[in-house]
A protein has these predicted regions:
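An alpha-helical support segment within catalytic cores of ATP-dependent transferases
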Residues: 8-18, 135, 147-188, 198, ...
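ATP-binding pocket architecture of kinase catalytic cores
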Residues: 42-133
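A glycine-centered beta->alpha junction motif in the catalytic cores
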Residues: 97-110, 151, 273-287
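A cross-family kinase active-site recognition segment
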Residues: 110-161, 183
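Active-site activation/catalytic loop segments of kinase-like enzymes and analogous catalytic loops
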Residues: 218-254, 270-287
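ATP/Mg2+ or Mg2+-diphosphate-binding catalytic cores
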Residues: 275-310
Length: 310
């Protein structure tokens, strides 16, 4: 999330009018590096206000919000609230706004078998549903794009730790064709940060589908394996048990193919590099942390362990 764009009083007035609410409190939400988000409190309810920062069309942004409405009955998600014009997105001062239900919950502080099985089930349900959605129906762009970040970093003159090693690693996986694998709409950013738990440590909400796009399912699978399991430095036995459990419970809802299993290691490396390069780009080239009004900084160095000794 994070905040890159100021919210001015005339825009607050516009939001109040468009959604028939009276805002009592607004706070910046610091975590994340792709959109501007605000916590909003009214007398009776709480909301999340998103200001879109991506260079996407209104129709592309609507695709995400329509998807949330379609999956809310079997996946716990926060849906967008339509304005008085029955539209998901409101436009004012050349800014695009969306208002979401606020769902209170607890951040994930510990990864265990129960959590891994739950995210596996929900991800399997999501992919089982979206396998029937074509690229033509969900043709929105994503900013989680290894090729873009690789090219921007390679042509720049910036230097940083592990630069040559990272670029060489990307070169090695560049020739693999993931498009031959089963595809549909994926979450694209399914990190523990985008999940909240209830008081019994069950998943209460999965949010931030704003980078969802049509892609091979193996990318979401690799993100979970990397950023829910491998990043935590479990011992060999625990790590492999968690990965096995994740794949088994996922397969109860969408069976993973042999071809996907064969490509799993290279997919994990690709997704690790994707988010490493995203962070490098945001920090070193785009200067997002300097430009942000309010943001929680995240270093690419925290992710290097995912590609070392592979």
């Amino acid at each position: 999330m994070g905040v890159f764009t100021n919210l001015f009083q005339d825009e607050i007035d516009f939001i109040e009018k468009k959604y028939k609410i009276k805002i009592l409190e607004i706070k910046n939400i610091d975590n994340g590096i792709l959109n501007s988000n605000f916590y909003i409190k009214t007398k009776n309810k709480k909301y999340i206000l998103r200001i879109y920062e991506a260079n996407r069309t209104i129709d592309e942004e609507k695709q995400e919000l329509i998807l949330l409405d379609r999956i809310v009955d079997f996946i716990p998600v926060s849906i967008a609230i339509k304005n008085i014009d029955n539209e998901y997105i409101s436009i004012f001062n050349n800014k695009k706004f969306a208002l979401f239900e606020y769902i209170d919950g607890n951040s994930i502080t510990k990864i265990d078998t129960h959590i891994i099985r739950e995210i596996a089930i929900y991800l399997g349900k999501l992919h089982s549903f979206t396998k029937d959605i074509s690229f033509e129906k969900y043709n929105r762009k994503t900013r989680i794009d290894l090729d873009f970040y690789y090219n921007e970093i390679k042509k720049s003159e910036i230097d940083f730790k592990f630069k040559n090693e990272l670029l060489n690693s990307a070169d090695k996986i560049n020739g693999f064709d993931f498009s031959i694998l089963p595809s549909g709409v994926i979450h694209g950013d399914i990190f523990p940060d985008n999940v909240l738990l209830d008081d019994y440590n069950n998943i209460k909400v999965i949010f931030d589908f704003n980078e969802s796009y049509y892609a091979p399912f193996i990318f979401d699978i690799a993100i979970v394996i990397n950023f829910w399991i491998k990043i935590n430095g479990f011992d060999f036995f625990t790590e492999n048990n968690l990965i096995r459990d994740f794949l088994n419970y996922y397969s109860k809802y969408r069976k993973i193919t042999k071809e996907e299993l064969k490509s799993l290691d290279i997919a994990c490396k690709k997704m690790a590099l994707t988010f490493i390069f995203l962070r490098i780009y945001k920090e070193k080239i785009d200067n997002s942390y300097q430009k942000a009004i309010s943001i929680q900084e995240k270093s690419y160095l925290d992710l290097i362990k995912l590609i070392k000794n592979k």
